Amino acid sequence: MADTKYIFVTGGVSSSLGKGIIAASLAKLLQARGFKATIQKLDPYINVDPGTLNPYEHGECYVTEDGAETDLDLGHYERFLNVNTSQANNVTTGRIYQSVIEKERRGEFLGKTVQVVPHITNEIKERIQILGKNGDYDIVITEIGGTVGDIESLPYIEAVRQLKWELGDDNALVIHLTLVPYLSAAGELKTKPTQHSVKTLMESGIKADILVCRTEHELSDDIRRKLAIFCNVRQEAVIQSIDARTIYDVPNMMLKEGLDKVTLKKLALPDDSTPNLDRWNQFLQRHKNPKAEVHIGLIGKYVELQDSYKSILESFIHAGAENEVSVNVEYIHSEFINDSTIHNKISHLDGVLVAPGFGERGIEGKIDAVRYARENDLPFLGICLGMQMAVIEFSRNVLQLKGANSTEMDADTKHPVIDLMEAQKEVTHKGGTMRLGAWDCELSKDSIIHAVYGVDKIKERHRHRYEYNNKYKEQLENAGMLSTGINPETGLVEIIELKDHPWFVGVQYHPEYKSTVASPHPLFVSFVKAAHEHSVKQKNAKMAQK
């Protein structure tokens, strides 16, 4: 293809309708037809990135291969497409304004008065087209965060209006995702909110090319015709998005509705192939028809909001399908774990995952959970802070290093088995300054982790400031906590495992960021397999007792 095509996805009526899933589903269908597609998210908040946002505010912060701290929607994009994203795939208002102000300070605007139009909108247009100009993609899908009519989104909507005009009708289209609510008292679907949302979009100079209508009930032909007439779109471009059992059903739903066909027609692209979703559907078949189930406890500090651990939860879905088991995740708040509660909260589980996080709140509960898993041969996976808690627990209770801790929690600890990385000691700013992105790790042969990956060297994504303190490495290894993954450049210990335990692994990196439908992460696959084996063993033991 000579020119990259652009698709813009806007939202109306309500937030949380699933623009990211619709964008990812359309991209999947286009990819399955042989097109090279990528997805970009424009976020209208003033933070430069979500790296400093509380998970309760914004869900998880997703880290890309190049070290960008981004919106969790980029996780959906990668999981659907099995293609890496980068900093260019996530733009915030804060980053836009930061760039424009820096240009003004350098004198690049030659004394002009810097304004939202044209300077901010030009910067937005430039960021939108970065991915399309490198020749890697046939189609770039850009999701506009927020809801049409929000004051924060106005510069983005104006930039899209200008760009659509500049590119021409055959090179750009707008998909508007909206809500068609069902009023149970009246027993009918109501189209008026969608009509008003489309009108608001048109007041900004944009005519939607395709309507995707989120609904709890089927849209009748009469409803579709009504929406087509009053929203000024073709009836074939009124697409139904009914509530699904799983987000992974949505690509097939959009295929059935013909979203990809309408898109190709409007972009003057050839519609001469059928999307090949065989591999996707094999995953769905295994996911929906498990042969067994396991119960895994997720020990965390932000469990009230499941989006805080979105990539972990999706990784369990991928690993469960690979093992043909259903993974039932039980959310356990680490603040509520202590000596009197731990047996009731954990004893029935088939595995324990101690989740990432920051700060001292709930730390002792995580350490107690690690100890229970270690002493009871329960499959254990510690991620980032979870690995650090495993080192602290082992140091306290096996090495008998009283008060062993991380300097993040106790700056004056006598035994800093986890310490601030040397490169972080002069850092004062919080945003974008951690050890981020993909780093090499060499694996020890004859280890659990080497068997998991089946290779000698891996590259995984990181997001942390604190590290395993190598001063305690010899003591820990002599007592049975092995260092089986080492960064070749720094000597940083990135993986630990226990010598005399069925399956006990801690990793400093975030494996959940690299699990996709097409490539479930081997660490999660192995962990779920170990949990299933533990479940079978426990059931057999109970049967023997009878």
From Swiss-Prot:
ATP binds at residues 16-21, 73. It is an enzyme of class 6 (ligase). Its EC number is 6.3.4.2. GO terms for biological process: 'de novo' CTP biosynthetic process; pyrimidine nucleobase biosynthetic process. Gene3D superfamilies: 3.40.50.880, P-loop containing nucleotide triphosphate hydrolases (3.40.50.300). UTP binds at residues 15, 190-195, 226. L-glutamine binds at residues 56, 357, 385-388, 408, 465. Residues 1-269 are annotated as: Amidoligase domain. This is CTP synthase. The gene is pyrG.
